[in-house]
Amino acid sequence: MTVIASLVVGSNGATSLNGRSSGLSTPADRARFLQRHRSAAAFIIGKKSAAIESYAASQVPIFIFTRSTQQLSLTHPLMQQVTVDRNLAEITQLIDLRITGDIVVEAGASLLQALIEVGGINILELSISPIAGDGDFINLEELLSKFEIESESEIDGTRLLECRYQRNSANS
């Protein structure tokens, strides 16, 4: 199956505004995000996303990646804590073997970048918003150097890119 990550980045490279990515989202980004979200066979999220985002309506497994061994308070019966104590690619592959369909990563910048570094993301759906954020900055050029842009469009000032991971990129 395919591991697909969604990421919205502000005009200044921030991935959050007031601690959340939703502040950077535009109608075009939100429509694409919801379409991908609703088609997921499973989710990989981080501990912070689990705490602030609502997955109440989800009917698929939700894997929460954390480095902590302390038991998290799980707010949904399909949430499973995954302690990241070994290679992220290996953990993601083990989850991939259990799931039929696409696994959608809805994580913050640090977890997403770690997954990209180990080749754990096949497709990146990147939205570049005209809104400036205030936290969790990334280097967009460095991020995109690991992917081939397969499609790009612009809707009302939001650039929507679909990118495929390059297994043989110079930086991997």
Where are the predicted features?
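Enzymes that bind and transform nitrogen-containing heteroaromatic metabolites
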Residues: M1-S172
